[in-house]
Amino acid sequence: MPLCDPGERQPGGSPVRIGALAPLTRPGWAEAGRHLLAGLELAVRDVNDAGGIVGRPLELVVRDTAADPRRAATAVDELAGLGVAAVAGEYHSVVARAAAVRADALGLPFLCSSAVLDALTEQPTPWVARLAPPQSRGWRLYADFLLSEGHSRIAVATEPSVYWASGARVLRDRLAPYGGTVVELDMRALTPAAVCDELADHRATALLLLVGHPEPAVPIVESVRRDRRLAGMTIGAPAGQPEFAGWATSLGEDGAGIPFLRYLPERLTPLGARVGTSLRERLAEAPSFVAFEGYDTVAVLAGVLRSSGADRTRTAASWPCVAVEGTRGPIRFSRVPGISVWQWGGAPIQVVDRDPAQPGRFRVLRTG
């Protein structure tokens, strides 16, 4: 049974510490990590300005995962030894999975901010919760978008990864009943120019980038855009690479008109609007959905910690009791079939792209 009643609380005293995981250096997607950390830090500031955790200041203990699962698992061990009340964050799915497995083994609450891989743990766990929607939900919506645009012959440029393989499987399973096919192009064996040859040979109408950014995503886009045989070819990036300013800086107009997934609602909540303004000031650029995920993560944990007294067991038992007004809507966790962690079932999903006429502006193409 969940422990939804407040535990014994002791006002004042030493800081309540939360471990924060984020990719802050290469080969991690450091731009995403910077946005995630900005959201986490802003929320901590707001929590402390409002009195902290029953008078105790909230403090982040940040660790750079650098897209390395082993480094993430080691960080979770270290943070547990430092006495953190919970661990939060992470962007890369495979890294988050390593962190989740270790947190589960240690009995340490982990609120995953951004990673979408369905199977964060092999077995159901009471210790882990997640804000981002599972990959199966988001990528099915993306497949539906492709079908609505008339695409049935899809090519995916892919690299070895559980995350990319899982995404390709979701796409294939969703497209197959409608006669759609998915051809995988192994980027270990192909140059960007060779990708263009494969696309022409397979008569694909859409190429999806299931690869890292900037390499090899950027040179693939540049090659496809310049190949006359592929005029009109749709390029897609379901993992969200075009969300960040670095994409536009690298590709300019070539990076526009590439649909991707992001996790924002049509309208932010009043809290979200205020937070968005503060994040823009902090980042000196428009905040991505990842920054809002970071903020919501701390907002949820602060509410849980106020009632649990920073006790790890009570914190984990409180996931089903969460009722927080986040930046993107009301947040509650439930058990979702096929998902091993506590899941926010109402996380918003959009398919968007950068407007070719104005690459700094996003167009919403589909919601779900």
Label every PLM stretch briefly:
Residues M1-G368:
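Extracytosolic ligand-binding ectodomains
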